[in-house]
Regions:
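N-terminal organelle-targeting presequences
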Residues: 34-100, 105, 132
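Glycine-aromatic-enriched surface loops/turns that form tight recognition elements
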Residues: 106-109, 118
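N-terminal [4Fe-4S]-dependent radical SAM core
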Residues: 114
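N-terminal chloroplast transit peptides
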Residues: 1-39, 51
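Alpha/beta enzyme core
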Residues: 82-90, 96-99, 111, 120-129, ...
């Protein structure tokens, strides 16, 4: 039992006495308190606590009786407080004087609550865009180089995948078509067929989910028999202006079907201004352009090209995509895209080019996107499958790092899996 008594050195008078239940946290303790409330007359009251053990309460004895303790308290003779408790260090730890530091940054990291309070970068499902591969068939076909990804049947499989993504908060997707070889040509005319695979998929999705945000890829490589992003001249040169003409028709066709954001990934010069003019001329002023501003000629695209069977039939893409060694060149592309009317600037790939993401973030007021490409995805998946890394932790860290570098949105094949983690669900 715990008795609390208020004592003064002058005349005192008991006002009332009550029993109260003591609480520890949210659970009632086994100890009870008897409280005497007294009115002070001339001198400051002192509080003396007398404790006895009813439950598992540890009280260190002072060697004095209760009466002696109360008398000592009335006389002002309080014992020295015990030294603060400190956890013991491991055996062999040297005994050193504390460093004379005025600033110890670890103080702000010492508890989960403090770490959460001071976190500078956050990630949510609204920051994620899910790339989806579609094809003309009805069956979902697994992509060997990208575990967990499929070429989705453009009707049932696509709708089911979008439903699952929306269920965890991902409401933005980007479509990439696998075009049959029979429909490919050197000029890529299938790219602007209003009844083609992509326009049909857009209309289907908008009919089922009117509020979904659909990004589309504007480039000729899925439709080209040569596998390049533009029309190839007989000497192997990619024809810039003629390709831009085709891209404008492709963007208008996608907008007509209901695309919210058209995304030229071709890296032709002047294509953003031409596409903007073409969209406006057809009454699609509200359709946004996400320009692949800094798209590098990267080796990280391999699994993607397998998924779409869009590898170049000859040569490479170094005459139009950027050199991985270049940094300042991204500023040239940024300035051009801003002047030409881009609404969003994208860097691709993401993780190996975080310095470029930060460069664009620091030099443009436009939203910045980053594409965590197929090679990045597959490396994390492979490391997780081999138990070399914790797949989920590496996935979340990689996305957070892309956000920290300055990306407002991230195109990632992890979108649904990451969103499931963010909302506390296991990805299905």
């Amino acid at each position: 039992m715990v008795t609390m008594t208020s004592v003064t050195l002058g005349d005192v008078r008991v006002v009332r006495s009550v029993d109260v239940q003591s609480y520890v946290g949210l659970k009632p303790s086994t100890a009870r308190k008897s409280v005497s409330l007294l009115r002070r007359t001339e001198t400051r009251p002192l509080m003396v606590v007398r404790a006895s053990k009813e439950g598992d309460i540890s009280v260190k004895s002072s060697g004095l009786s209760i009466e002696e303790s109360e008398a000592a308290a009335v006389a002002g003779n309080f014992p020295d407080p015990p030294p603060p408790w400190r956890p013991s260090a491991p055996k062999g730890t040297p005994n050193v004087k504390p460093l004379p530091l005025t600033r110890r940054p670890r103080r702000n990291r010492k508890s989960p609550t403090l770490r959460d309070a001071f976190q500078e970068t956050n990630l949510s499902a609204s920051n994620l865009v899910l790339p989806l591969f579609i094809h003309e068939g009805e069956e979902d076909v697994p992509i060997g180089a990208m575990p967990g990804c499929y070429r989705l049947g453009w009707r049932h499989g696509l709708l089911e995948e979008v439903y699952k993504a929306r269920d965890v908060g991902v409401n933005s997707i980007v479509l990439f078509p696998k075009i049959p070889d029979a429909l490919k040509s050197q000029a890529g005319d299938e790219a602007f067929n209003d009844n083609g695979l992509v326009p049909r998929a857009i209309r289907l999705l908008k009919d089922k989910y009117p509020d979904i945000v659909i990004y589309t890829d504007v480039a000729l490589d899925p439709y080209s028999s040569d596998g390049h992003d533009g029309i190839v001249r007989e000497d192997g040169v990619i024809m810039n202006d003629e390709t831009v003409h085709q891209l404008c028709k492709q963007a208008v066709s996608q907008a007509r079907a209901g695309a919210d954001v058209v995304s030229p990934s071709d890296m032709m010069d002047g294509r953003v201004s031409a596409i903007r003019a073409a969209l406006d001329a057809e009454g699609f002023q509200e359709v946004s352009i996400m320009s692949y501003t800094a798209k590098y000629a990267s080796s990280f695209y391999g699994p993607f090209r397998e998924a779409l069977d869009s590898n170049p039939r000859f040569g490479d893409k170094k005459t139009y995509q950027m050199n991985p060694a270049n940094y300042r060149e991204a500023l040239v592309e940024t300035e051009a895209d801003e002047v030409e009317g881009a609404d969003i600037l994208l860097v691709k790939p993401a993780m190996p080019y975080l310095d470029v993401v930060r460069l664009l973030r620091d030099n443009s007021a436009l939203p910045i996107a980053a594409y965590q490409v197929s090679g990045e995805y597959s490396m994390i998946k492979a490391g997780g499958a081999l138990k070399m890394v914790d797949e989920e932790k590496v996935m979340m860290e990689s996305l957070l790092c892309i956000r920290r570098a300055g990306a407002d949105i991230i195109l990632t094949y992890f979108a649904r899996q990451a969103a499931s983690v963010l909302c506390g669900m296991k990805s299905k």
